[in-house]
Amino acid sequence: MGEFSATILAASQAAEEGGGGSNFLIPNGTFFAVLIIFLIVLGVISKWVVPPISKVLAEREAMLAKTAADNRKSAEQVAAAQADYEKEMAEARAQASALRDEARAAGRSVVDEKRAQASGEVAQTLTQADQQLSAQGDQVRSGLESSVDGLSAKLASRILGVDVNSGGTQ
């Protein structure tokens, strides 16, 4: 630290020996030279560097605006497509429901028709069976009636021990 203090002390003595000086509040020629160089660099930057950067930034901003517009348009198209989809699905569901109802009605009519046909066949079969049973009953009745006379005579002959048909005794 001693060396550093010695350097500062030597610099301050050299400034005092130089005759005293310059006031930093009063501009000197160096200030104007630096100011002119700064203005030239500023002009060069504003003339050749800033316009391309501004152009690129403007293009980027336009591209972002276009992308945002495209996104909005796409969102609207998606919403419209979704609405169309829902509409078509509702129509398809309605058509499917109508087709199901028609198929059920057709099925019921076929079932009713087959039931009526089966009922008719059953009635016809019952009528035929009734006729057959009546005919068989008549045949059996006539057969029994014809055999009753012979059987009753035979039974009477057995019980009485006399031949009933011939009128004699056994």
UniProtKB/Swiss-Prot annotation:
<feature type="compositionally biased region" description="Polar residues">
    <location>
        <begin position="122"/>
        <end position="139"/>
    </location>
</feature>
<keyword id="KW-1133">Transmembrane helix</keyword>
<keyword id="KW-0472">Membrane</keyword>
<comment type="function">
    <text>F(1)F(0) ATP synthase produces ATP from ADP in the presence of a proton or sodium gradient. F-type ATPases consist of two structural domains, F(1) containing the extramembraneous catalytic core and F(0) containing the membrane proton channel, linked together by a central stalk and a peripheral stalk. During catalysis, ATP synthesis in the catalytic domain of F(1) is coupled via a rotary mechanism of the central stalk subunits to proton translocation.</text>
</comment>
<keyword id="KW-0813">Transport</keyword>
<keyword id="KW-0375">Hydrogen ion transport</keyword>
<dbReference type="GO" id="GO:0005886">
    <property type="term" value="C:plasma membrane"/>
</dbReference>
<dbReference type="GO" id="GO:0046933">
    <property type="term" value="F:proton-transporting ATP synthase activity, rotational mechanism"/>
</dbReference>
<dbReference type="InterPro" id="IPR028987">
    <property type="entry name" value="ATP_synth_B-like_membr_sf"/>
</dbReference>
<dbReference type="Pfam" id="PF00430">
    <property type="entry name" value="ATP-synt_B"/>
</dbReference>
<keyword id="KW-0406">Ion transport</keyword>
<dbReference type="InterPro" id="IPR005864">
    <property type="entry name" value="ATP_synth_F0_bsu_bac"/>
</dbReference>
<comment type="subunit">
    <text>F-type ATPases have 2 components, F(1) - the catalytic core - and F(0) - the membrane proton channel. F(1) has five subunits: alpha(3), beta(3), gamma(1), delta(1), epsilon(1). F(0) has three main subunits: a(1), b(2) and c(10-14). The alpha and beta chains form an alternating ring which encloses part of the gamma chain. F(1) is attached to F(0) by a central stalk formed by the gamma and epsilon chains, while a peripheral stalk is formed by the delta and b chains.</text>
</comment>
<keyword id="KW-1003">Cell membrane</keyword>
<comment type="function">
    <text>Component of the F(0) channel, it forms part of the peripheral stalk, linking F(1) to F(0).</text>
</comment>
<keyword id="KW-0812">Transmembrane</keyword>
<protein>
    <recommendedName>
        <fullName>ATP synthase subunit b</fullName>
    </recommendedName>
</protein>
<dbReference type="GO" id="GO:0046961">
    <property type="term" value="F:proton-transporting ATPase activity, rotational mechanism"/>
</dbReference>
<dbReference type="InterPro" id="IPR050059">
    <property type="entry name" value="ATP_synthase_B_chain"/>
</dbReference>
<keyword id="KW-0138">CF(0)</keyword>
<dbReference type="InterPro" id="IPR002146">
    <property type="entry name" value="ATP_synth_b/b'su_bac/chlpt"/>
</dbReference>
<feature type="region of interest" description="Disordered">
    <location>
        <begin position="121"/>
        <end position="147"/>
    </location>
</feature>
<comment type="similarity">
    <text>Belongs to the ATPase B chain family.</text>
</comment>
<feature type="transmembrane region" description="Helical">
    <location>
        <begin position="25"/>
        <end position="45"/>
    </location>
</feature>
<dbReference type="GO" id="GO:0045259">
    <property type="term" value="C:proton-transporting ATP synthase complex"/>
</dbReference>
<keyword id="KW-0066">ATP synthesis</keyword>
